[in-house]
Amino acid sequence: MKCGGGCHDGLVAPSEDPEEHVAPAAQRVRAGTLLLANTDLFEPTFRRSVIYIVEHNDGGTLGVVLNRASETPVYNVLPQWATLTIKPKTMFIGGPVKRDSALCLATLRAGVDPEGIVGLRHVDGRVVMVDLDADPDSIAPVVEGVRIFAGYSGWTIGQLEGEIDRDDWIVLSALPSDVLIGPKTDLWGQVLRRQPLPLSLRATHPIDTSRN
């Protein structure tokens, strides 16, 4: 499972900037922003999902769901990348598109400039895309870890804007740490809680609305 070519072959890494710790609320969609599923989005594929935008241009929008771990070990699919993969060392479900392909994101170590490093493509801040055809041994010294996604989420021109207009998604700033979030973290709630009021109150929204 590989994401071939230069289109989806990179990782993005977080920075040590103080700004990482306070993410401002709503902004325009661009590479490096988050799409947070609104509380009324009940479609199973994207309910309470947090999507990291990897590309946003005239050709459309591409992102990966950050909080959908699978049970498939990375070692079973791409064994050469298993050591660099952050726990849980499983494939994540990046979205419904091309589930038989893989896309890899990483966070750079503090102070590393991705410019000129073979196998890395800068996304935003310290987040980069990693070419899965690259040599993991050459990537290891410059990244804190990688996460590999099966498939991705994609929108054609204007499609995402329409979904945002009907309040399916909230556009927010990402922190580098979001990309490699731990397995037991409620990323959806965590992202909301760091927003200003009243948006942060949505983090208390019950998972099962029948309990409300």
Where are the language model's segments positioned?
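A short aromatic-anchored loop/beta-hairpin motif
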Residues: 2-212
